[in-house]
Amino acid sequence: MVQAKSWTLKKHFEGFPTDGNFELKTTELPPLNNGEVLLEALFLSVDPYMRVAAKKLKEGDRMMGEQVARVVESKNSAFPKGTIVAALLGWTSHSISDGNGLTKLPVEWPDKLPLSLALGTVGMPGLTAYFGLLDICGVKGGETVMVSAAAGAVGSVVGQIAKLKGCKVVGTAGSDEKVAYLKKLGFDVAFNYKTVKSLEEALRTASPDGYDCYFDNVGGEFSNAVILQMKTFGRIAICGAISQYNRTGPCPQGPAPEVVIYQQLRMEGFIVNRWQGEVRQKALTELMNWVSEGKVQCHEYVTEGFEKMPAAFMGMLKGENLGKTIVKA
């Protein structure tokens, strides 16, 4: 019998998560029925959205999340033993599936690309960057793009795609190391928002004419400051609000309505699951090719050991990661 280890939500978060919010449980999995497969986690993802999505869980539920897994036993001809898949299986070491929700990695996946990239640049974060910038913002060559949390899994890809499309790109991050990383990726301007004397002045200096597009990963007062410097007909893709996820007080006031009205701005929130089927597959293929050709670089912040899932999650929320946070099981 296979023993599956799973991280569960012991207690709902109040403010920033702590070790006490999580509990590691072990369960014995039953034998496979016809049509089922046994999966072993290889790499697991931790992402900011999990902080908010956990509100929908009951205490005792398994933490949600995507993983790259290997089929170690199969009674389903569509997924023979050894098949590598990506799936929303949660924080668990082993699981049983009937095949629904399992996505095989593309057959053309280059050998030189780590499988873990299916959780990052060639997965949900990369798709979020791709569709948020190209569809929601509708970016055009020659425009100026502002990216917050630019050294993260999504922001770093946003900036690089914007450069591929011929844009000027400004990015912000929370450490000098991350700023150096952004410049290495090709960002035209990058600065540490924690050390500048005035965020408003730093934004103005980076782009005196303002911003055509803002890819918002942080929300809060930071984003209010950016919105004040948007050009007329500017577009804002609201992807995340990581600065607000652990708040215990009231939500801060949003941008002044008159700014949005008179600058004729368009603000749109989005979730990447909106794009499915052929358009999603086409985007994944393009991302995979960009990475394989060296046009898009990616950095993974890897934590070794399934038992360190909560630590990796909390570290990501603190901004300890450079690029995509991954746990290697």
Swiss-Prot record:
- UniProt subcellular location: Cytoplasm
Q: Which residues carry this modification: N6-acetyllysine?
A: 178
Major location (coarse): cytoplasm
Which parts of the sequence carry Phosphothreonine?
18
Per UniProt, what is one GO molecular function of this protein?
leukotriene B4 12-hydroxy dehydrogenase activity
- Residues recorded as binding NADP(+), renumbered to this chain, are 152-155, 178, 193, 217, 239-245, 270-272, 321
- N6-(2-hydroxyisobutyryl)lysine modifications at: 178
Q: What is its EC number?
A: 1.3.1.48, 1.3.1.74
- Give the matching PANTHER family: PROSTAGLANDIN REDUCTASE, PROSTAGLANDIN REDUCTASE 1
> What is the protein's name according to its record?
Prostaglandin reductase 1
Species source reads Mus musculus (Mouse)
Query: Could you tell me the gene encoding this protein?
Result: Ptgr1
